[in-house]
């Protein structure tokens, strides 16, 4: 995949070739906004090497060469080499950065760089790139294949471990629905979720770790074996710099009941042991109705999102005390989104993501 470039990338040819001011600014914006978290690959007194992965966006696509690996055609792997050469006399907090994409093409610049820890996650960092100045590539360019991503620091994440108490937006209606009880706040630029209290996990089937409402409803209301679309949704390991990860309900906030996602159905029968519905309601239910997404609002009230009925068709009150509103931090929210093609299309439609996910359904 290669998009037609709508602006020139370079100011010259040959050894003096470097990015134009417009291109290097776009590159900085892409590294800051469109990548996942950054994993430290190597740190020594001379150079710091970091790596990040995400789905390719229109902002980053002009810097990516034509890909021959059809298994990861929409994925970008960025490796950065950070140094402070004495002969450049760089200002404080400014570094020389070589950026490599997909182990094939590199660019050089200086930039004001801020690297900061991400709350509750070890070995990965957030990063911002500002005030870039393009430079020609040095004669000797490092090979990122010589510095593989450490295999022992790549756990399968459970997003429930990273939930934070919410700081509510002033306008709860300025949001996009990702799945029932999961929202992107346009105002706060972060994800908000309804999640059950940890003590309710004991009421769930063995091996169940999902606490976020969309994932719980997916388990309760989707067909047991899943459909091809559900089972083969592609995710990038944007939290740990992995080009791909195994699908699992705890690893992304995109999970939702299959027929709600694909067909816009809002009234769905429980597909598992109805006893498991007691994590949501004060008694067992056989049918759950999901609120319309046409006028969404971030809410801490479970009853604003779902309603349930029993086998006799009578309403069953929700278990509101067992569910709380949480949020993810801004940096982590952006990484979660950049690792999921569906979330990219919902949260950042203005960037016209390239992951090939279908358009979300409004119900």
From Swiss-Prot:
It comes from the Viruses. InterPro entries: Herpes_UL16/UL94 (IPR004286). Keywords: Host cytoplasm, Host nucleus, Late protein, Virion, Virion tegument. It is found in: Virion tegument; Host cytoplasm; Host nucleus. One of its GO terms (cellular component) is host cell cytoplasm. Belongs to the herpesviridae cytoplasmic envelopment protein 2 family. Plays a critical role in cytoplasmic virus egress. Participates in the final step of tegumentation and envelope acquisition within the host cytoplasm by directly interacting with the capsid. Upon virion binding to target cell, a signaling cascade is triggered to disrupt the interaction with the capsid, thereby preparing capsid uncoating. Interacts with cytoplasmic envelopment protein 3 and with the capsid. This is Cytoplasmic envelopment protein 2. It comes from Varicella-zoster virus (strain Dumas).
């Amino acid at each position: 995949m290669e998009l037609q470039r709508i602006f020139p990338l370079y100011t010259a040819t040959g050894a003096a070739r470097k990015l134009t001011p417009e291109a290097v600014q776009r590159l900085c914006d892409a590294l800051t906004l469109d990548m996942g978290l950054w994993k430290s690959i190597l740190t020594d007194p001379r150079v710091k090497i970091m790596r990040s992965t995400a789905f390719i966006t229109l902002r980053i696509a002009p810097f990516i060469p034509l890909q021959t690996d059809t298994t990861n055609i929409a994925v970008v792997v960025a490796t950065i080499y950070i140094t402070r050469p004495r002969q450049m006399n760089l200002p404080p907090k400014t570094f020389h950065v070589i950026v490599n994409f997909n182990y094939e093409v590199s660019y050089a610049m200086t930039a004001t760089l801020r690297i900061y820890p991400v709350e509750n996650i070890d070995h990965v960092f957030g990063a911002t790139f500002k005030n870039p100045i393009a430079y020609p590539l040095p004669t000797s360019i490092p090979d990122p294949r010589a510095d593989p991503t450490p295999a022992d620091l790549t756990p399968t994440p459970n997003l429930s471990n990273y939930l934070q108490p919410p700081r509510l937006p002033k306008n709860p209606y300025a949001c996009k629905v990702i799945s029932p009880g999961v929202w992107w706040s346009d105002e706060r630029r972060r994800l908000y979720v309804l999640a059950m209290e940890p003590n309710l996990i004991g009421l769930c089937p063995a091996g169940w770790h999902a606490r976020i409402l969309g994932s719980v409803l997916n388990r309760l209301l989707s067909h047991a074996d899943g459909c091809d679309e559900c089972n083969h949704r592609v995710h990038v390991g944007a939290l740990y710099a992995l080009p791909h990860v195994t699908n699992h309900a705890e690893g992304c906030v995109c999970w939702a009941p299959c027929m709600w996602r694909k067909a816009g159905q809002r009234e769905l029968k429980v597909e598992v042991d109805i006893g498991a519905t007691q994590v949501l309601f004060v008694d067992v239910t056989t049918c759950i109705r999901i609120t319309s997404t046409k006028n969404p609002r971030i809410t801490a009230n479970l009853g604003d999102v779902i309603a349930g009925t029993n086998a006799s068709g009578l309403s069953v009150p929700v278990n509101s005390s067992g569910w709380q509103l949480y949020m993810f931090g801004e940096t982590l929210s952006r990484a979660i989104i950049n690792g999921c093609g569906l979330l990219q299309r919902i949260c950042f439609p203005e960037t016209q993501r390239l992951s090939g996910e279908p358009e979300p359904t409004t119900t």
